[in-house]
Curated annotation (Swiss-Prot):
This is C-C motif chemokine 2. Residues 1-23 form the signal peptide. Acts as a ligand for C-C chemokine receptor CCR2. Signals through binding and activation of CCR2 and induces a strong chemotactic response and mobilization of intracellular calcium ions. Exhibits a chemotactic activity for monocytes and basophils but not neutrophils or eosinophils. Plays an important role in mediating peripheral nerve injury-induced neuropathic pain. Increases NMDA-mediated synaptic transmission in both dopamine D1 and D2 receptor-containing neurons, which may be caused by MAPK/ERK-dependent phosphorylation of GRIN2B/NMDAR2B. The lineage of its organism: Eukaryota, Metazoa, Chordata, Craniata, Vertebrata. It comes from Bos taurus. Its main location: secreted.
Amino acid sequence: MKVSAALLCLLLTVAAFSTEVLAQPDAINSQVACCYTFNSKKISMQRLMNYRRVTSSKCPKEAVIFKTILGKELCADPKQKWVQDSINYLNKKNQTPKP
């Protein structure tokens, strides 16, 4: 009887601490998109709609995710020149006010 009471006490303690851990900001189910491989071919700038940088410590590599006009997302290496040129192109394109 003492063993089951001690086991129940231990189980309740673990359950109480696990809810506190889950309530922490890092434990929130946030979607972090990670890139494990990079697109090997250069993407035409005219096909690109926007981009976002992946710098999360939860991801193995820093990356840039481009979104195409067809809605596809492609991972690219931010160190490659064509990726940097595409980022500059999209920054200028999105800054230009439309009439």
